[in-house]
């Protein structure tokens, strides 16, 4: 999100100060790095949104943008209404806001409501295909328009043509923004950045310098980064942040596996982390323990988090066989064709998979697929089959989307100092957000 200025029309002293701020020096895991913050085309410069406002550079007026005819037909909960009022107050004052509410709070529906309130054509920026589809479904569910000639929402690809300008909401992947015509991008008065901690990565944050809205809304349950690019948040979005942290009773069972992974070292003397994860994922006894935990809790709906597809495939096959007895078709005199049509109890979400059977009792997925842009409100149990530390609160929130469930987490702890240190980090997260830790015995 940026402001567009003609450098020849800027006071020389202001321009000099802008140039001094054009490069951000960051510490990237102990390594100094320079990040270029502006975009210059001939005499036109694009300045990060909040930085421009700090220099009193003009924000585009409302009448520059097309209005939308969309009305919100949903209903916000009381806690969402409070956040809405706070966001409107901040937007009226600063034109930008970060909404950092826990997973399952309802940031999507809240942002749609805000866009309808602001009544300007809205661009939604995401980083994953699954997020594009979820936003479109939500907009169609919660919005209606009297003008049937203009689509309520369109998904924009790099091949999209000019007719896609004629919509109330547009959804685009951040990587495609630089490929679009500038005139198209300048038609959006409101921009929503979903999962902003992902968009602010080194490869994608500069896409924000191509859009020039009046209002800017950033969404994330984890609005921070650990690679030094955390410093970009106030530069683009300002310092105003609405925070709602998860605080809900949940039970964590620590499962001591007794498994001791083989530790290998590279030529640089550092531990080979990938080799350790491979050993962890392929250990048969450890994987059988996971199957047994699922088998012992048939009333639960599991989310099993893995980092290696081969582990997920093995677990899916064994859990289907051991926990749901796939040979029961023989007892019921079902034919082979009938057995093939029978729905499976275990679904997977990894690799090229973008969808899964929502009637499943067990969902196995990689952290890349389930960390963001994932919505399955039947889940009540998380089983950590792989090591996870960063943005862990995102995963906990996946099993707390419904108020009428008692969330349970099974955290597998292996015999390794590094893995145990990571468990200690997760333990802090559990206790901070209402967790009660117990030991689990098979």
Swiss-Prot record:
Record-annotated Helicase ATP-binding domain positions: 88-241
Motif DEAH box: where in chain: 194-197
Keywords carried by this UniProt record: ATP-binding, Helicase, Hydrolase, Nucleotide-binding
Cysteine pairings via disulfide bonds: none
GO MF, one example: ATP binding
Sites where the protein binds ATP: 101-108
Gene3D superfamilies in the record: P-loop containing nucleotide triphosphate hydrolases
One Pfam match: ResIII
Superkingdom of the organism of origin: Viruses
InterPro entries in the record: ATP-dep_DNA_Helicase (IPR050615), Helicase/UvrB_N (IPR006935), Helicase_ATP-bd (IPR014001), P-loop_NTPase (IPR027417)
E.C. no: 3.6.4.-
Family the UniProt entry places it in: Belongs to the DEAD box helicase family. DEAH subfamily.
Official protein name in the record: Putative helicase 161L
Organism the protein comes from: Invertebrate iridescent virus 6
